[in-house]
């Protein structure tokens, strides 16, 4: 179930402040964040976020198609190595 429309989209205040500061100065640097729950706003376009996946910060470059999604959607937390192979068929 999605978020109520009357509440509007959510993004952490510290994240918005960092993006506004970088937009004013015109700098491009990686913004480290643990806020996977924040919605991507149009102001975030062109910036690279280091989204924490529980172990490291995954670089996520924000494009126009990502607006409206959450930052955590683009930094997977689980690594799938495949199912174990059947040892009987190897003989």
From Swiss-Prot:
GO terms for molecular function: rRNA binding; structural constituent of ribosome. The keyword Metal-binding does not apply. Pfam families: Ribosomal_S19. InterPro entries: Ribosomal_uS19 (IPR002222), Ribosomal_uS19_bac-type (IPR005732), Ribosomal_uS19_CS (IPR020934), Ribosomal_uS19_SF (IPR023575). Keywords: Ribonucleoprotein, Ribosomal protein, RNA-binding, rRNA-binding. GO terms for biological process: ribosomal small subunit assembly; translation. GO terms for cellular component: cytoplasm; small ribosomal subunit. The keyword RNA-binding applies. It comes from the Bacteria. PROSITE patterns: RIBOSOMAL_S19 (PS00323). Belongs to the universal ribosomal protein uS19 family. Protein S19 forms a complex with S13 that binds strongly to the 16S ribosomal RNA. PANTHER family: RIBOSOMAL PROTEIN S19P FAMILY MEMBER, SMALL RIBOSOMAL SUBUNIT PROTEIN US19M. This is Small ribosomal subunit protein uS19. It comes from Exiguobacterium sp. (strain ATCC BAA-1283 / AT1b). The gene is rpsS.
